[in-house]
Every structure is written in C-alpha cells, then in structure tokens.
UniProtKB/Swiss-Prot annotation:
Positions of the UniProt region annotated as G3 motif: 215-224
Region feature (G5 motif): 354-359
Residues that, per the record, bind GTP: 49-54, 163, 188-189, 194, 222, 288-289, 291, 356
InterPro entries xref list: Gprotein_alpha_su (IPR001019), GproteinA_insert (IPR011025), P-loop_NTPase (IPR027417), Plant_Gprotein_alpha (IPR002976)
Organism: Oryza sativa subsp. japonica (Rice)
Region (G4 motif) location: 284-291
G1 motif: annotated span: 41-54
Full protein name: Guanine nucleotide-binding protein alpha-1 subunit
Record-level Gene Ontology MF annotations: G protein-coupled receptor binding; G-protein beta/gamma-subunit complex binding; GTP binding; GTPase activity; metal ion binding
Expression (tissue specificity): Highly expressed in young internodes. Expressed in the base of the stamen, pistil, lemma, and palea before flowering and in the pericarp of the ovary after fertilization.
Lineage per the UniProt record: Eukaryota, Viridiplantae, Streptophyta, Embryophyta, Tracheophyta
Induction: By infection with an avirulent race of rice blast fungus (M.grisea) and sphingolipid elicitors. Down-regulated by a virulent race of rice blast fungus (M.grisea). Down-regulated by 24-epi-brassinolide.
C-alpha cells in the first residue's frame, strides 16, 4: 500500500515537472511569435554586381556593432584575391585588345612587364595563392603603371573589371604591410559573390530606442544560378528592396557576356513585380552606383543601352547628369506601373538615388525608408 502511494507520488511529481516544462516551452514559443510579429522582413534583390552586398555591409556598420577585428582580418585574403583578379583581367584584356583594335599598338605591354603579367595571372588561377608582400606589390605596381595597362583600364566596362580596381591599386603598399588589418572602407570595397542567403537584424534609429522598428534584411546571390534560392523567401515579406546599378548600362553580364546588364535588370525587376506573393508588398528601388554613373555619362552615351535608345542628351556637365538620371528614373517608374496589375498600383513604391559606398547617404536613405514604412502601417 505504502509502496503504491510512493509510486503514485513519484508519478505525480514527474507529471508536474513535465507539465511545467511543456508550459515553459509554450510560453517561449508565444514570446518568440509575438517578437516575430514586430520584426519587419526586408528582401534585398537585384542582379549580380548591383551593389546589394555593399548595402548589406553598410547596414552592419551603421546599425549594428560593425566588424570586429577577426571579421576584418577574414577579408584580407578576399582583398588580396581582388588585386590578383584585377591585374589578371587587365593583363588578359590588354593582350586581347592588342589583337583586335585598329590602334592596337597602345595596348602592347613591354616585354619585361609581359613576364610579370604571366606570373601574376598564374597566381590568380591558384587556389593557394600567396598573400601580397612587398615583392609581389612591386610587380603589381610595375604592371599597373604600364601605359598599355592604363589604356586597358579605360576600357574596363567591357572587361568585367570590378568596381574596386582603382581603390585597391591606389592602396597597394598598405595592403601588403606586415600585420595588415583591413579597414572598414577596405571591407566595403572588397568583392566576393554572395552564395546562399545571409541575414541581419537591425533598427535604423538605433538598437536601443524604445519602440523602434526592427527589420530583418535578407541578401541573396544575384547571379542567375543563385536566383532559384529566392522563391522560398518571398512569403511574408514586408518590403522588397531592389538594387539596380544604373552605371552598368554599357556593360555585359559576368555569367553571359552577350546580355546587357541593364536589360537583365529591367527583365528581373519586371519578373519580381509580377510575383503573386508581392501583391501587397512595398517596393523600394535603389538606383545605385550613382557615383560611377555621373562620371560615365559624360563619356558613354546612355543610348548604347537598347532600353534607353530614345534618350536625347541636352548639355555637358552636371545638368546632363541630372537629365540622364531623371530619364532612367522615369523608365523604371513606367516599368513599375506597366508591370503592376491595377489592384497593386497603390502599394508603396519609392525610388532612392544611392551610392552604396557612401555611408551617410545609406544611413539617410534607410531612415527615410523606416519613416515611410511606419507611416504606411499607420495609414498616414
């Protein structure tokens, strides 16, 4: 009898403990669900090389704790790889241009520098490439300063030359210093393709503000082979931030050198706009890389892009830059309304001029986005 009571008491205690654990789990799930309801999901989309990942890194720097020393150091090999990649593209580009251009002589590299070019190109093709040192930097500098390479650099838009090329070439000595730790600016310029999905949680008004809106930003690879990973992220999105590199109207895709990058961006934006799951989703368009655009538009006519063939320039200088920008902006606005069904045109749609490397501008832009989305939720 006593034994039976003892067993019954033990079972009762076990059941109580089990119920308490279950209630604790339920309570935590409820808390997490409530917390999730206050997190606004942002999806960062765009074609490859649009500057999405630079925007993502800026958010980490601006609204989180930034990069610690270990994270900064992890970019050393990436940055050195960018240098090798740049010099190889220029070297191979010069060789090709010297064969096909009518004024081919200006692309002929001196014999001594050809030897250096072969050596550095071989390094870029290796998985175990050495980190930059003083000796290698002297070689890179010597080849970079060759007149043929400088002429080739001016043709960078046809060579898949990364935007970071000039920045890293101007900082070679620092990059090769013993104990080199990349700066925040180095990290922003560093080019590494996004594979898979990365996310970050932040508040544009500061993590400590009471009642501040919290956002979760997702960045996914922009190259064609990465886009199949986008679909599973589409549900429950509060806003799509679409990055369009407006400076790339004369460039071809990295993965398909027969396809103009701006035409690819147009088609991709059109496709995203038509997705059923975005019927009520806000759209934010970043017309990015304006810093490169304002320099290029003075030299390369906007009409080289099929989409912009009806563009009529007005005058050289700043006035022309603004005129060209407004033309591109209008094209995207027209595309938005053409691609949106009548019942979707009242969803929030904002366009921002951006330069992903400009920290102040990115900060200001995200504060404006935060304000716009808050007003939309409040119906004001």
């Amino acid at each position: 009898m006593g034994s039976s009571c003892s067993r019954s008491h033990s079972l009762s205690e076990a059941e109580t403990t089990k119920n308490a654990k279950s209630a604790d789990i339920d309570r935590r799930i409820l808390q997490e669900t409530k917390a999730e309801q206050h997190i606004h999901k942002l999806l960062l989309l765009g074609a490859g090389e649009s500057g999405k990942s630079t925007i993502f890194k800026q958010i980490k720097l601006l609204f989180q704790t930034g990069f610690d020393e270990a994270e900064l150091r992890s970019y050393t090999s990436v940055i050195h790889a960018n240098v090798y990649q740049t010099i190889k593209i220029l070297y191979e580009g010069a060789k090709e241009l010297s064969q096909v251009e009518s004024d081919s002589s200006k692309y002929v590299i001196s014999p001594d520098n050809q030897e250096i070019g072969e050596k550095l190109s071989d390094i870029d093709g290796r998985l175990d490439y050495p980190l930059l040192n003083k000796e290698l930097v002297l070689d890179v500098k010597r080849l970079w300063q060759d007149p043929a390479i400088q002429e080739t650099y001016l043709r960078g838009s046809i060579l898949q030359l990364p935007d970071c090329a000039q920045y890293f070439m101007e900082n070679l000595d620092r990059l090769a210093e013993a104990g080199y730790v990349p700066t925040k600016e180095d990290v922003l310029y560093a080019r590494v393709r996004t594979n898979g999905v990365v996310q970050i949680q932040f508040s544009p008004v500061g993590e400590n503000k009471r009642g501040g809106e919290v956002y979760r930003l997702y960045d996914v690879g922009g190259q064609r082979n990465e886009r199949r990973k986008w679909i599973h992220l589409f549900e429950g999105v509060n806003a799509v931030i679409f990055c369009a590199a407006i400076s790339e109207y004369d460039q071809m895709l990295f993965e398909d050198e027969t396809k103009n990058r701006m035409m690819e961006t147009k088609e991709l934006f059109d496709w995203v706009l038509k997705q059923r799951c975005f019927e009520k989703t806000s759209f934010i368009l970043f017309l990015n890389k304006f810093d490169i655009f304002e320099k290029k538009i003075q030299k390369v006519p906007l009409s080289v892009c099929e989409w912009f063939k009806d563009y009529q320039p007005i005058a050289p200088g700043k006035q022309e830059v603004e005129h060209a920008y407004e033309f591109v902006k209008k094209k995207f606005e027209e595309l938005y309304f053409q691609s949106s069904k009548p019942d979707r045109v009242d969803r929030v749609f904002k366009i921002y001029r951006t330069t992903a490397l400009d920290q102040k501008l990115v900060k200001k832009t995200f504060k404006l986005i935060d304000e716009s989305m808050r007003r939309s939720r409040e119906g004001t």
